[in-house]
């Protein structure tokens, strides 16, 4: 799996549009400070009147406590992700994210590779060998079937994209599906709070953990309440 942050919101106007907002210190990130500015705009509390929420970390902690997460929607983060088709299917259920995904009609997906489900690494000995053999056999068979179907449809006069459109029916869920995904921080928090959980699919849980790690680099106070270990039913 590959997960790489490629874009995020950066503040452009140090004067805060001529308002009376008193900016925090330079260590506060653009995403965290923009969320605070948006929240203070709702109540015109630009001068930080409450000492308990004077610092950005405390202000956003209060925002998270009361569920006023709309202020987190003003900043976004964009990731380049290489993961399986099954992860894409899971991730697309989060409808506030925006996707641009490699086309299986225009691109030969057999050249993109596969992603082995994490459960395979939990096997040992002969079980691991047998499981890996089955997986590789399926990959080989699917690739041969795909190429054969493309050949049949192409010889029948179908354009390449229509041939691939038909042939992709035999591709396994583990097929690599490079994607560009954008979401605001409220949306990303929703993804992580649902997928960074012991009961989640192992591959998307791995994705959620890596997303969390990188999102904390650009918005640490926005994600301050998310645990470093996956959520569990026990707490």
UniProtKB/Swiss-Prot annotation:
Residues that hold dUMP according to the record: 90-93, 103-105, 168, 195
Lineage: superkingdom: Viruses
Main enzyme class: transferase
Active site: 195 (involved in ionization of n3 of dump, leading to its activation)
Record-annotated ThyX domain positions: 1-229
Keyword Calcium: no
GO molecular function: flavin adenine dinucleotide binding; NADPH binding; thymidylate synthase (FAD) activity; thymidylate synthase activity
UniProt motif ThyX motif: location: 93-103
Cofactor note: Binds 4 FAD per tetramer. Each FAD binding site is formed by three monomers.
SUPFAM superfamilies: Thymidylate synthase-complementing protein Thy1
Enzyme Commission number, as recorded: 2.1.1.148
Key word Disulfide bond present: no
Positions with a binding annotation for FAD: 70, 93-95, 184-186
Pathway(s) annotated for this protein in UniProt: Pyrimidine metabolism; dTTP biosynthesis
Cofactor(s) listed: FAD
Cited InterPro entries: Thymidylate_synthase_ThyX (IPR003669), Thymidylate_synthase_ThyX_sf (IPR036098)
Keywords: FAD, Flavoprotein, Methyltransferase, NADP, Nucleotide biosynthesis, Transferase
Entry-linked HAMAP family: ThyX
Family named by the database record: Belongs to the thymidylate synthase ThyX family.
Quaternary structure annotation from Swiss-Prot or TrEMBL: Homotetramer.
Entry protein name: Probable flavin-dependent thymidylate synthase
Lineage of producing organism: Viruses, Duplodnaviria, Heunggongvirae, Uroviricota, Caudoviricetes
């Amino acid at each position: 799996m590959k997960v790489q942050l490629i874009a995020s919101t950066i503040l452009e106007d140090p004067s805060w549009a001529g308002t009376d907002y008193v900016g925090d210190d330079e260590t506060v990130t653009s995403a965290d400070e923009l969320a605070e500015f948006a929240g203070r705009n709702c109540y015109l509390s630009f001068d930080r009147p409450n000492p308990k929420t004077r610092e950005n970390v405390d202000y956003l902690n209060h925002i998270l406590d009361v569920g006023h997460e709309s202020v987190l929607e003003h900043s976004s983060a964009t990731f380049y992700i290489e993961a399986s088709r099954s992860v894409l299917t899971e991730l697309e259920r989060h409808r506030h994210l925006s996707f641009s995904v490699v086309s299986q009609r225009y691109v030969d997906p057999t050249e993109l590779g596969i992603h082995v489900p994490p459960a395979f690494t939990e096997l040992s000995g002969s079980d691991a060998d047998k499981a890996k053999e089955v997986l590789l056999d399926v990959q080989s068979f699917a690739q041969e079937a795909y190429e054969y179907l493309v050949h049949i449809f192409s010889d029948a006069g179908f354009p390449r994209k229509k041939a691939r459109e038909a042939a992709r029916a035999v591709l396994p869920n583990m097929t690599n599906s490079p994607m560009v995904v954008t979401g605001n921080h409220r949306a990303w928090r929703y993804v992580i709070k649902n997928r960074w959980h012991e009961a989640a699919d192992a591959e998307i849980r791995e994705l959620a953990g890596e997303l969390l790690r990188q999102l904390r680099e650009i918005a640490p106070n926005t994600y301050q309440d998310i645990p470093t270990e996956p959520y569990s039913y026990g707490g």
